[in-house]
């Protein structure tokens, strides 16, 4: 744990839940950057670049604000893509694209690549890392896909799926479920520890 206040630079309900489950008390701030303006063909590089951009956008906002507590905080920003059969997938842009994503996971697993940037705002120390987890699926029924898309959550998730809604269709998981959710538990804890020293 850390004695400093924590800021999660994300509006993701799944990342929030991971931090809550880890026992942290924190506030959230949304970076509001144009992620599509940042491109790279390597998933690790792409997620690191986007995570850094989120952190820089929030750092600028915090430094310009009058909130002294924020200026003494530790900030966590992360980004996730899903790699499917060598192709990077971000959030689906249409329901049809989401449907195609979900139908494809029985043939190749979803590989979550998540980069995390942690900043000690007061000292300026920045650390970062990347974690990978692979989720295998069995065939997802068309009826269930319709239901998922109608609920809407999957439209806001890299790769167009949420493991917590798809337990009946998941097979082997290699790595941490928190990485699939968008915030690797072990990596995040280690990075927070590094900037807290």
Curated annotation (Swiss-Prot):
InterPro entries: ITPase-like_fam (IPR029001), Maf-like (IPR003697)
Record: active site: 79
SUPFAM superfamilies linked: ITPase-like (SSF52972)
Positions of the record's site feature: Important for substrate specificity: 14, 80, 164
One cellular component (GO) term of this entry: cytoplasm
Enzymatic class: hydrolase
Cellular compartment(s): Cytoplasm
Principal subcellular localisation of the protein: cytoplasm
Annotated keywords: Cytoplasm, Hydrolase, Nucleotide metabolism
EC number(s) from the headed UniProt entry: 3.6.1.-
Example GO BP: nucleotide metabolic process
Annotated function: Nucleoside triphosphate pyrophosphatase that hydrolyzes 7-methyl-GTP (m(7)GTP). May have a dual role in cell division arrest and in preventing the incorporation of modified nucleotides into cellular nucleic acids.
UniProt record similarity statement: Belongs to the Maf family. YceF subfamily.
Protein name in UniProt: 7-methyl-GTP pyrophosphatase
Organism: Dictyostelium discoideum
